[in-house]
C-alpha cells in the first residue's frame, strides 16, 4: 500500500499545487508509481499544470457516486511530462461536489494499493475542502512562504492536522529569497520560522519563476540537463 501525503497550507498562493506537481514528478522520475489527487473542488488546477485538462471526462466525484470505474477517472500524465508512471485524479469542477471525508477514507486506501505514493493537493484554508483532503492522509507537508501571515496560518494548520491524528508533518518554505528575507526583517533566521510554526523543516525552495510557472517541465528538464 502506497504512502499518502497531503500537501497543505493555511494561506492561498503559498504554492501547494506547484509543490504537489514537483514532488510527484520527482518521485516518478525516481521510478515510483505516483497518483496525484486534486482536492480543490471548484478550483482544480493540476489538470492544466500536467497538460491533461482537455482530456477530462470524469473526476473523483464520479468514482464515489458510481458513475464510472476508478480507471476511467485517472489520467496518465505521460504525454506532457514523459513520465509513464505519473497519474492524476482530478477534482470536481464544482465546489458543491467536494468529497465527504468518510468517502475519502474509503476510496484513498483502495487506490493506494496500486501506487507507491499518493499525493493529495489540498485547497487553501481550513474549510470543508481541507477536512476532505486530509481525511485519508498518513503524513503532511505544510507549505509556507516566509511572511508573517502565512507562517501564522501554518501553525494553525499544524494544530488542526494533529487534532486529526496526522502527527508526521514537515515544513516546506517556498519562494524563498535571501535578499527579500533580509529586507523584510520579520525574522532573524529560518530557525525562527521553524519555531513559530512548530513544524520540522524538510526543504527550502527558491523563488524560481520557472519552477513556479511550470513545475512539471522544470523538474523533468532539470533531470535531463
Predicted regions, residues:
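Inter-motif core of Ras-like GTPase G domains
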Residues: 127-148
Amino acid at each position: 500500500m502506497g504512502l499518502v501525503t497531503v500537501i497543505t497550507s493555511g494561506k492561498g498562493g503559498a504554492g501547494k499545487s506547484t509543490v504537489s506537481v514537483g514532488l510527484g514528478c520527482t518521485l516518478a522520475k525516481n521510478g515510483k508509481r505516483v497518483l496525484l489527487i486534486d482536492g480543490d473542488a471548484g478550483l482544480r488546477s493540476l489538470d492544466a499544470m500536467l497538460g491533461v485538462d482537455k482530456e477530462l471526462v470524469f473526476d473523483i466525484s464520479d468514482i464515489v457516486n458510481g458513475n464510472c470505474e476508478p480507471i476511467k477517472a485517472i489520467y496518465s500524465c505521460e504525454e506532457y511530462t514523459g513520465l509513464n508512471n505519473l497519474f492524476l485524479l482530478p477534482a470536481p469542477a464544482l465546489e458543491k461536489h467536494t468529497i465527504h471525508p468518510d468517502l475519502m477514507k474509503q476510496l484513498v486506501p483502495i487506490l493506494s494499493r496500486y501506487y507507491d505514493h499518493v499525493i493529495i493537493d489540498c485547497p487553501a484554508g481550513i474549510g470543508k475542502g481541507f477536512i476532505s483532503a486530509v481525511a485519508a492522509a498518513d503524513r503532511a507537508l505544510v507549505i509556507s512562504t516566509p511572511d508573517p501571515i502565512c507562517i501564522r496560518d501554518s501553525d494553525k494548520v499544524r494544530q488542526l492536522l494533529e487534532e486529526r491524528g496526522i502527527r508526521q508533518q514537515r515544513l516546506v518554505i517556498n519562494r524563498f529569497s535571501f535578499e527579500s528575507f533580509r529586507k523584510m526583517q520579520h525574522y532573524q533566521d529560518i530557525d525562527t520560522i521553524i519555531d513559530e510554526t512548530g513544524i520540522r523543516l524538510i526543504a527550502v525552495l527558491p523563488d524560481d519563476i520557472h519552477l513556479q510557472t511550470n513545475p512539471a517541465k522544470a523538474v523533468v528538464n532539470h533531470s535531463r540537463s
